[in-house]
Amino acid sequence: MLNRATMDMLTAMKMSAMAAEFANQLKDPAFNELGFEERLGMLVNAEWNRRQCNKLDRFIRNAQFAVPSATVEGIEYHEDRKLDKAQILRFATCKYIDEGHHIILKGASGNGKTYIACALGNAACRRFKKVQYIRMPELLDELSIARSGGTLKKVLESYKKKDLLILDEWLIRPLSPQESYDMLEIVEARCQKSMIFCTQYQSEGWYTRIDPNPESDSPVSEAIMDRIIHNAYEVLVDGRVSMRERKGLKAAREGGGQDV
């Protein structure tokens, strides 16, 4: 009766893993040979592990990754991709986040930049760092709506709090003057905070996409570039075959399709 009441109280206190482990100990006579401290340690460990797993799931869910299942272990290092595995593994330690550096993933569409970015984001979540993934067109829309609704400061503050911001489709299209200022606000708000940029364009081509007017000598382009380029690791994600095509061929072979 006392044991049942104990399990009910553990469940009421939302210590479900501890309650389950306690029930297992009651069922198995072998646990009777263990000391009180050891059995208590096993109960606490079970509850700790459950809460850490739930916390990790929450961090990953809140990050809103395009590829939530992406992992550093799942990155493919085909020769034509020219990826430096040692460098990727160093990124996975999140030291660049601790030091406030950025990462620029450059490459053609379909070369797997998004997967790598989400994999590094997942690695950061596993170290319980707050991560946010967003496509640049969606971010620009969000900032525009926030400015119209008078909540721009609140939105900027929310992005400022993230340990890592992943901006996919960076400069996928040229920016309007207002959008350029908005991006400067984001970059400035994240001073000394890390960002990952996924882009199809070399960094020297960013100026004309931030400010498409060839007659303009806007300081905004220079301000954005200065806050990113000089503090970033640039990684080329190459490949003669796109990862979408590569995955399609692999699926066809595994499904009994024609060997290509």
Where are these regions (language model features)?
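Charged, compositionally biased N-terminal leader segments and the immediate start
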Residues: 1-19
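Conserved P-loop
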Residues: 83-161, 207, 254
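Extended interfacial segments that mediate partner engagement and assembly in macromolecular machines
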Residues: 53-106
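Conserved phosphate/pyrophosphate-binding and hydrolysis machinery centered on Walker-type P-loop NTPases
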Residues: 12, 29-34, 65, 77-81, ...
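Interdomain "pre-motor" coupling segment immediately N-terminal to P-loop NTPase/helicase cores
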Residues: 16-68
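Short, well-ordered alpha-helix to beta-strand connector turns
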Residues: 162-163, 232
